[in-house]
Each structure stands twice: as C-alpha cells, then as structure tokens.
Amino acid sequence: MKDADDSEEVKEEQAKGTKKGRKSSEPAATENDDDKPTKNKFAGILSKFERSKKARELEKTRESTKDEDSTEPTTAEPVIAQGLEPLPQPEAAPEQDEMPTYSSLPPWLANPLRASAQERRKFADLGIDSSLLRVLEDNGYREAFAVQSTVIPLLLQGPTNHPGDLCISAATGSGKTLSYVLPLVTALKPLPAPRLRGLIVVPTRELVKQAREACELCAAGSGLRVASAVGNVAIKDEQRESLPGYVHRSEPNVDILICTPGRLVDHLRYTKGFTLKNLEWLVIDEADRLLNESFQEWVDVVMTSLDARKAPDAFGFSGNFLSGLGLPIQSKEPRKVVLSATMTRDVTKLNSLRLANPKLVVIGSDAAATEDESGGVAPSDEQFTLPPTLEEHTVSVGDGSQKPLYLLRLLLSHIKLETKILVFTKSSESASRLARLLALLEPSLSDRIGTIIKSNKSSASRKTLTAYRRGKISVIIATDRASRGLDLRSLTHVVNYDVPASITTYVHRVGRTARAGQKGSAWTLVAHREGKWFASQIAKGSDGKITRSTKVGKVQFKLDNMKEVKARYASALDLLEKEVKTGGTKASKPSAQ
C-alpha cells in the first residue's frame, strides 16, 4: 500500500513540473517576439559590414600573393606542341643602287692613260728614224692613228718615253700591230751575229702572218732577220731556219721571232740552243685570249726561261766569277708590251707576266668612261671600245625557225652582194649547212660563197681568202676562228647569224669591219628568246662595258613577198636532210622556179 502511495506522489509532482514548464516557456516566447523587429532593423548594416570585411580580407590575400610571387621564381607555362608557322617579318627596306667611290684595282689599272680615238698625228712628229719614215711613205703610211700616236712616243727613246712595260687596250683594226712593230725595229740595231732579241706571241696563224708582214715591211733594208713559228710547219724545218747549226753548232739565226704559244713552248723544250737569254722585247698580242687559255702553260715556261738568264752559267766565266765572290748577277728584264681589244683587268693574270712599272693605255674611251654621274667607280673590270665608224643593227627573226630566209632577205635587199660580207655562225657544222642551204635557196649565190671553218685545212682556207681578195667571192661564212687576226680589207658588213656567246666574242666579231678608219656595219639576227640578253648585255652595254659612238639600231622586215622562196626553203631542207644521211654528197643545184 505504501508503494502505491509513493508512485502516486511522484506522478503528481511530475504533473506539477510540466505545468510550471509550460508557464515559464510562454513568457520566453513573448520576449523573442519582441526582439525580432530590432534584429531586422540592423540586418542591412551587418550585411554591409560583413561584405566590407570580406573585401578587405580578399585584398590582403592578393597583396600577400603578389609578395610571394615577387620573391619566388616564376614557373614557365607548359609549351603545347604545334605545327611550324612562319614568323612575321618586317617589310623589306628598298634597295639602293650604290656605287663604290673607290677602286680595288692597283693605281696603274684604275687610272689609265686615255686617248681619243679621233686623234691623228704625222709619223714624222713621232720621233721615228728617217729611214723608217721613207719606208712608211713608200707604202702609203703618212698619218698615224690614235693608238700609234699615243703608244709609239711611249716606247721610243725620248722625253715622252715610259721606263717600264705597257698594256694597251684599243679596238680591233685600230693599228695596234704597227704601234709596237715600229719601236721594236727601231730599238733593235743590227748585229754581226743575229740573236733572238724580239719575241712576238700571238694566238693564231693568221695573226702570225699579219705580224710578220708588218715586221718585214718595217725591217726592210735594216739587216734584221725575221722568222715565224707556227704549228702547221714541221718543227725540224723551223729548227733549220732559226738555228741552222742545230746538230753540231747551235746558234740563233733570227733577230725577231713571231710565233704561237704552243710552238714557242715546243722550241724552248726540244730545240737545242733555243733560249731567251738575249731577249730585249716581249710582245703579247691578243693578250686576253693568251692569258685565259693555257696553251701548254706557256706563261710559266717563258718566265722560267727568263729566270734561267740569271744563272751564273748563262754568263760564262764572268758569271761564275761573280757568283764565286757572292755578288748578285744583274740581268735586265725584257720590255713587255701587252695588247688587246678586250684587255683584261684581272690582276692575277697580269701579275703572271711580272710586269715592271706598268702603264695602261686606253684608246677610244672618254675620261668618264669608268665613272657614273654620281662619281662612283663602275663595277666592271673590263672595258671594250668599238670602232667609231661602226654602225650596229639588230634584225628580229621571230622564233628563229625561218632564220635562213631572213638572212637571204638581208643579203639581197639591205646589204647588196656587191659589197664584202662576213657571216659568223656558232659551229663549223652550222657554217657548212648554212652555205649549202643558201646555195639551194638562191643558186646565183653558190659561186659567191666561201667558208672558213675549223675542219678546213690551211690550204682550203687560203684558197677561200685568195678568192675573196681577187673578188671571186663576196660572202664568207665562218666560225669564231675568223674573229681574231683575220684582216679582210674592204670588208663592209659583218653578220652575226648566231648570237655571240659573250661580249668579248661580239667585240672581236664586229671588229673585222670598220678597220683603219673605214666605215662598216654589223648586223645581228636575234630571236625572241635571245632578245633580252642581247639588249641588256650588248646593245645597252652592261655596266658600261662597251663604249660606242652610236646606238644600236633595230631593223624589222616581213617575209610576206617570199612565197616562192619559202617553197624552195621547204624542199631545200628535205634535200639537205637527204644529203646528210647519204654522207653529204652534193646534189645538183635546183633551178630557180
């Protein structure tokens, strides 16, 4: 019973506590309801404060990050592999054509002695011996050309003598041969026993013949002996002529020798007693070709032979005596005269000749030829001068397929066959084919055409030249073999059927005419593909290389009125093809239609 009463008391107390709790919770709820308006009133201010606080903290964080970045090394971002792309380039600056105001050439090459091509003087005013003057007058020489008027006083003894070697640049046909032959003959006094004292080296047999004729003319009556040496004569025959005692007693028999470089080397190597120990004059004509081509290394052989003159044995007892005393042997170097229409200014090539106190003489070029208007020095190391009486023309031949017809039209309508004509081709085969083709196209020309080609024997070339001089033929078709040393008097026209391969070749080709002050014309057949090169390099004279008196003219004509000739041209080509296949047998000449 007691336990039951206790449990009831506990329940009552719990119930009372529950009631008290409810009563106490009601006033609390009332207080919270009173605080709500106050909190809402300051919520905006608090939110602004919180945002401002966060912004300040964020700014501090950023500043601390910057400080860390400045103290710590930066880490490169990883490079992503991509394809190659061109880098952007700035625009190229415009190029300016600047000419150097200085020359790398030695002074004697950079500042030559220049003379006008129009200069003329009487031979009597040049200091030539009276005996030589009579010889010249008897042969019709009374007035000296520009190169002779300038060079002869420099080589002869006198107030204007140049004590050294000479290099001479003058146009072909300007009289260079006589300009060195006259002083050479004057300087070499006759001796009781002939000695080789004058040596003239030229590249071709035609030039050997021309120089020998000039030497024999000037040496007439002087007692000087003149000989020549070329490759078409057996060396034993020349040995008997120049050294009659070749086997038992070797002694020279000539005072002046004109030779080609190859034959000179043969004599120096294989002819006993043939030496240059007494040489006083060494003349090198057409020097550009002789120095550009080796010709059995002739320069080295000649210089070695000249060095042998300084050996004690060359002076006999006196030489050995001086050598024993330790005294040097003095040997005077021969005077060297170097000539060319296209004189090289290559210092290396000229140095191989061991020139002493050299002077360059340029004929036919104005003083300002190597300078432009701004005062710069022209970059060209070569200067070419054409004869002042030469007229130049170009003939357009289209694509070149009918070039023989253009040549025929030029010969018949513009040049006339009564004049003398020299036609240049690029090869011997081309020259032979062209001569045959012209004969087939115009049968009347067959007896008036001759050829000078490399395959010709010397006798055949001589026959052609003899027929030309006698007037039997008026047209010669030749290769560049005839561009040097061939002196065809009264030649009025040169035709370049094939465009020359270089400026030098062109200068030597057209130099066959307008010689010795006579008038002459040069014609060049130019196809479309060749026009640009010819115009820039030759007609306009690239870099001022060519000095000419008149501009190159242009000639154009059509083949409209040549229907019959065109028909013969087609049949002639067929016939020419058959002749080539059958071994070149000449068919009968076709009759004119």
Curated annotation (Swiss-Prot):
Complex and partners: Associated with pre-ribosomal particles.
Stretch list, region Disordered: 1-103
GO cellular component, one term: nucleolus
Residue stretches of biased makeup (Acidic residues): 1-11
Descriptive protein name: ATP-dependent RNA helicase dbp6
Compositionally biased tracts (Basic and acidic residues): 48-68
Catalytic activity: ATP + H2O = ADP + phosphate + H(+)
Annotated EC: 3.6.4.13
Motif mapping: Q motif: 121-149
Alphabetized UniProt keyword annotations: ATP-binding, Helicase, Hydrolase, Nucleotide-binding, Nucleus, Ribosome biogenesis, RNA-binding, rRNA processing
Organism: Aspergillus niger (strain ATCC MYA-4892 / CBS 513.88 / FGSC A1513)
Helicase ATP-binding domain span: 157-361
Positions in coiled-coil regions: none
Similarity comment: Belongs to the DEAD box helicase family. DDX51/DBP6 subfamily.
EC category: hydrolase
Helicase C-terminal domain sequence ranges: 407-563
Gene Ontology terms for molecular function: ATP binding; ATP hydrolysis activity; RNA binding; RNA helicase activity
A Pfam cross-reference name: Helicase_C
InterPro entries: DEAD/DEAH_box_helicase_dom, Helicase_ATP-bd, Helicase_C-like, P-loop_NTPase, RNA-helicase_DEAD-box_CS, RNA_helicase_DEAD_Q_motif
Functional summary from the UniProt entry: ATP-binding RNA helicase involved in the biogenesis of 60S ribosomal subunits and is required for the normal formation of 25S and 5.8S rRNAs.
Lineage top rank: taxon: Eukaryota
Free-text comment about domains: The Q motif is unique to and characteristic of the DEAD box family of RNA helicases and controls ATP binding and hydrolysis.
